[in-house]
């Protein structure tokens, strides 16, 4: 049986569903898993999940088998009871678009409800029979094949079916193509809408949606509503890792909305009964001219959070403004404990959210090329003092290998120009995805950091990015000695001569590189994926919101001008 016809592409619909799957699910059941597209993507986010699929199309099921842990081929209505799943073990139930293919969806929902944990989520995509394209096609006599869909569902009937099955819908989102043609449709149907006594606004909403994304839960307790709103002041540096990816994961938690904007913010986006967090990412607040911004947030009942992942001493403006960026907030989130210790002298309410990776791609054969000459990666900002003393060694080793070793450099043009080889590539500062692609094309990563205060407070993000990308690292002890097991998950150098020795070793010993890559990859997979930690943020924000009376008193003592 063919799935319901959509005007949107299958890929875009799968991507929409992927946004809402809880990133830390231990067991997922997808009914109508197709060729395993969602499972394949999700397994990079959470490789430890047990992903079970059911598919009636044998060919699609065959293609999906490699992506899923288990798959059952057969008619959902007839065969669902044969699934090897214990009651109350499923964290997320997904219906792609096949719920309407089932003659009695309520029966299936009831059965699946028995498999769900108390806090499990249900995700469903439902085609909208009132979509304006469908109405036009019907009027033209081009109604879609009725055999494709056995059970048309409206939003109201869907809510009834879910309630009967003991499931509570807590959110419905719409997707659909609008544009000029939709506006023409509304204009043409306006007399009919008025003649039938229909509400124009409701009609517009109902006909604009090609399909609904329905989110439900087994729990009868409504989720606590939270808006996480971030103003990104430095999108190029760590905006993805520190804001965008955590936001995506937080948005999978029932009741959580996330909004991020660059350098501007609308403070009127909160919904009724929604608690609010406002996060300043890498923001230098001016004293006293920016006090009014903080006052506005206090008046709107926001929890005010500063987000910083680099040492403030790099920017004298922080001190020049009496560290208002941290003193003027309720609390601070940062990336390392050493940085947190520094920040606590300006605000005692500091928490560490380590940098984690949102996904980990599969290691493949391209990670271990057969040719004998590896590629070297170097990519960093403000590192000249860190690499200066090892540059002669790098050039000597490149020369010893007759310039057959390729070096790829991101952003650091001086490092690139200092390389005495023609076998090199330079890339300017680039988008995060492109950065990861370049990184994954290399074999050895160089991570030098001198032992100075600013460097001591940096995170180990570069190492975990290399490890997840199949790149063996040669790193300084500063920052990395506490994370890298020397000789197992990477190599640590303690002097220039030690760097030379270990760099040569990594270049000529392919077996050593492979062993390091595999062990580092597995360490990151087991310890440093965002799916293992993302709920900490939401839990901490809610805890801080509960503590707002205390936090406001402390804030008043630090910056009394905010309350005058």
Task: Give the residues covered by each predicted segment.
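Nucleotide-sugar-dependent
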Residues: 314-315, 385, 433, 437-438, ...
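A charged, aromatic-enriched C-terminal amphipathic alpha-helix characteristic of glycosyltransferases
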Residues: 360, 508-550
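Conserved catalytic-core segment of nucleotide-activated headgroup transferases in glycan assembly
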Residues: 232-255, 359-360, 369-440
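Conserved acidic donor-binding segment of nucleotide-sugar-dependent glycosyltransferases
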Residues: 486-497, 505-511
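Conserved N-terminal segment of class I S-adenosyl-L-methionine
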Residues: 1-88, 185-186, 209-212, 233-245, ...
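S-adenosyl-L-methionine-dependent methyltransferase catalytic module, highlighting the catalytic core
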Residues: 103-111, 121-220
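Extended catalytic core of nucleotide-activated donor transferases of GT-like folds
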Residues: 96, 259-342
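N-terminal pre-catalytic "stem/leader" segment of glycosyltransferase-like enzymes
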Residues: 219-285
């Amino acid at each position: 049986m063919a799935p319901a016809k959509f005007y949107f592409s299958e890929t875009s619909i799968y991507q929409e569903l992927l946004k809402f799957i809880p990133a830390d699910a231990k067991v997922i059941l997808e009914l109508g898993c197709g060729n395993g597209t969602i499972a394949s993507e999700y397994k990079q986010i959470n490789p430890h999940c047990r992903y079970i699929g059911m598919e009636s199309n044998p060919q699609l099921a065959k293609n999906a088998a490699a992506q899923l842990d288990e798959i059952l081929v057969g008619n959902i209505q007839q065969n669902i009871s044969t699934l090897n799943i214990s009651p109350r073990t499923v964290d997320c139930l997904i219906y792609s678009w096949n719920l309407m293919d089932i003659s009695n969806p309520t029966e299936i929902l009831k059965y699946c409800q028995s498999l769900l944990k108390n806090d499990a989520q249900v995700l469903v995509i439902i085609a909208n029979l009132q979509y304006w394209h469908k109405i036009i096609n019907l009027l033209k006599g081009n109604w879609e094949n009725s055999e494709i869909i056995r059970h048309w569902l409206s939003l109201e009937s869907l809510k009834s079916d879910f309630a009967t099955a003991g499931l509570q819908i807590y959110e419905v989102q719409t997707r659909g193509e609008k544009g000029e043609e939709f506006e023409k449709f509304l204009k043409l149907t306006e007399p009919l809408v008025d003649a039938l006594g229909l509400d124009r606004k409701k009609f517009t909403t109902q006909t604009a949606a090609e399909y609904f994304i329905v989110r439900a839960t087994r729990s009868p307790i409504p989720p606590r509503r939270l808006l996480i709103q971030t103003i990104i002041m430095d999108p190029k540096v760590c905006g993805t890792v520190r804001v965008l990816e955590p936001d995506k994961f937080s948005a999978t938690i029932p009741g959580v909305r996330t909004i991020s904007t660059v350098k501007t913010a609308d403070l009127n986006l909160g919904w009724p009964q929604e608690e609010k967090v406002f996060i300043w990412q890498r923001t230098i607040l001016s004293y006293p001219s920016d006090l009014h911004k903080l006052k506005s947030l206090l008046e709107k009942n926001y929890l005010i959070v500063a987000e910083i992942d680099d040492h403030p001493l790099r920017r004298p403006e922080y001190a020049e403004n009496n560290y208002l960026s941290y003193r003027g907030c309720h609390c601070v989130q940062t990336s390392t404990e050493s940085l947190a210790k520094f920040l606590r002298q300006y605000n005692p309410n500091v928490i560490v959210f380590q940098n984690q990776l949102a996904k980990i791609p599969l290691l493949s054969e391209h990670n271990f090329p057969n040719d004998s000459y590896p590629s070297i990666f170097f990519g960093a900002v403000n590192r000249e003092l860190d690499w200066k003393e090892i540059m002669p060694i790098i050039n000597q080793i490149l020369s010893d290998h007759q310039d057959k070793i390729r070096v790829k450099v991101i952003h650091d043009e001086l490092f690139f120009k200092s390389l005495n080889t023609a076998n090199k590539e330079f890339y300017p500062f680039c988008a995060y995805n492109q950065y990861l692609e370049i990184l994954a094309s290399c074999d050895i990563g160089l991570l030098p950091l001198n032992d100075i205060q600013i460097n001591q407070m940096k995170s180990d993000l570069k190492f975990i990015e290399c490890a997840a990308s199949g790149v063996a690292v040669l790193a300084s002890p500063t920052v990395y000695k506490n994370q890298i097991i020397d000789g197992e998950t990477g190599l640590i150098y303690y002097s220039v001569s030690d760097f030379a020795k270990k760099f040569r070793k990594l270049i000529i010993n392919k077996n050593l590189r492979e062993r390091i890559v595999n062990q580092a990859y597995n360490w990151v997979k087991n310890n440093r994926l965002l799916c293992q930690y993302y709920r900490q943020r939401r839990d901490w924000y809610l805890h801080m919101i509960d503590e707002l009376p205390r936090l406001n008193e402390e804030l008043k003592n630090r910056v009394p001008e905010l309350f005058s």
